[in-house]
Every structure is written in structure tokens, then in C-alpha cells.
Amino acid sequence: MKVYSLIIGVILSGFYSSFAQDNKAVAVVSATSCEAICKANTSKKALLLQSIANKSNENKTKSTDGMVWVAAGEFKMGTTDYPDAQPVHDVSVKGFWMDQHEVTNAQFEAFVKATNYVTIAERPLNPEDYPGVPVENLVPGSAVFSPPTDKVSLGNIQQWWKYVPGANWKHPSGPESTIVGFENNPVVQISYLDAQAYAKWAGKRLPTEAEWEFAARAGRAHTKYYWGQDLKPDGKWVANIFQGTFPNNNTAEDGFVGAAPVQSFPKNPYGIYDLEGNVWEWCSDLYRDDYYKNTTKVNPQGPLDSYDPEESGVEKHVQRGGSYLCSDEYCIRYVAGSRGKGETTSACNHLGFRCVKDAE
């Protein structure tokens, strides 16, 4: 049951608490990179998602167009920089196909046109979930990064995150925004359930956390960043992350204030783009902060249940890669091996996904 504090003109919560300041990379990050501030009525979600996903077609199911083959291999997974990514441990994965880039607005639009799918952020809110909240305030929407004009303390994320009625994948920053002209940008305002529905329709699936990190490391040593030891190798930005003073002054030294069109930065040795920065990406694994202490080493699929000690009782899935809002002074989640987490129905304007596919 939701509480009244979720909606006070805008809907607020402990949302995005993993953006709490990382004074040191080893600091305990307080919560998720993209927590829900608004939960749509999903009581029928299982049946709805299944009916949508079943509209996949045979040709799409068999196609690996736009994907890269990632051969089986072993690697060291995790990082000592964050408690929930420890211990660093040996993992092996079988070969799989991975989307060369994040799912774009154009690709997601094709899915919606084919299936009439309605994302979580677009669905009406159930008054029963928000007792005491006036019905007129229960307007579908989502979380939008809204930077303050001046420098602020980093202790209160509500200074730069706002619930915006009408924000969804077609209108990422609110009703006045559009994806027209941004068809090649990664689709955002996507919940785990939305990503899962698209993946099944496309004859694919979401990557496991192990597959995602294996592809991001791309055979490279256990470096600080996926691309190497230096934040700016040879003085060049190689990922879309935040430069300047967070959250009010993004100097956009890498050429982008928000999300960049896919393939704007160099591909990794496996031929895959934007596995670090740009937008967070959903993985199939449920999130547990202690999972690495008990995980299997061969093709790990994630824990059987979700548990976050900072928000027990809330089902969360793993997110990976960081986004254009991660900087070297705040939310350094482009550090190789680091993890994010998000409530299953959460969405925001720096969260997207890509898909993988098993070998035939």
C-alpha cells in the first residue's frame, strides 16, 4: 500500500538514493540508481505481458540482425570498490548474441505499433494504491532529471529529481518533449516489465548480470573502468557521462548533456557500443546485496528472490553501466564491476535496456 507522502503535488519517495554522494568509490551506496517514485497498477501485469510478448513473429524470433556474437569465456566479476559487488569472483558464461547498441526509440516504437503495448509510466494509477491522495493528483507520469540552477547540497536528491505527469517513453522529459528527431537515441522511461515485454516480442531476452559484465569487459584485464585505467584515455572522453559540477552544471565536454544517439562513442573490442554511460540498462537478475557471496560460478542467473536491506519487501532487478548522470564526483557507477538496482516497475529518463539471444 502506498503512502500519502508519495504524492504532494509531485510524487516523491526515497527514489534514486544510489545517487547519494559517493565521497569515495568504496562508500556504501544507499539504494538504487533508479528507484520508483510512482507505481502503476500492475495487478494484471503477468497476463498482460504474456499476451503482448506472444505477438512475436517467427522471422523476428530467428533474426540476429544488429547483434554481436559473444563467445563463451571466463572472467573475474565484481569490484572491490562497492560492498554489493564483492567478492570479486571467477565466473564463466556460455556464448550468446548481444544487441550492438541499446534499444532505440525507433525500435521500441515498432514494438508498440505491432502490439499496442502500454508502458507502466502510461498506465492509470490505482487510487487503492495511494490512500488519502486526491484522485485528481493521480496522473500517470514518471521521474525526470530536473537540474537546479545553482549548486546544491548532494544530500537531497529531490532537489534534482521531479515526478512529471505525462512523462513516458514518447515524452521522456514530460508532455512537451518528444522523440521525434531522436529516433536513434536509446529509449528511456522503461521499467523492467516494459523491457521484458519488448525482449520477448523480439525473440530475445534481457541479459544476465554476468553476461552483461562479461560483454562490457570484452576480454580486457580487471581495469578500473571497462575501457581501461584512465578516465580520459589519450585525453578523450570515450563514454557519455557527466562532466562539470553535479547536478547543476553539466559542461558536456563529451558533446552531450543528456542521452547520446547510440554508437556515438567508440565500440569495445567485441564490437558493442555504450555498455558504459549513456543510459542505465536492465539485467534479468533479481537484486540481492549479498548475492556475490553465494553465487554459482557457471552461467549465474541471479538469486531466487530479491532483497535490499535498505528497502526490504520491494522487488528489485539489477541495472548496469551507469548513465549520462554519473560523474567522478557523484554516482561513479561506470566503474567496472559496479552494480545498480531498481524496483521492477520503476522508470526514469536515464534508464533503458538492450537484449541478448541464446545460440540456436
Task: Locate the predicted segments by residue.
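Short, compositionally biased
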Residues: 3-4, 18-176, 193, 218, ...
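Bacterial N-terminal signal peptides
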Residues: 7-14
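Functional-site microenvironments in short loops/helix caps that host divalent-cation chemistry
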Residues: 69-70, 76, 124-336, 344-347
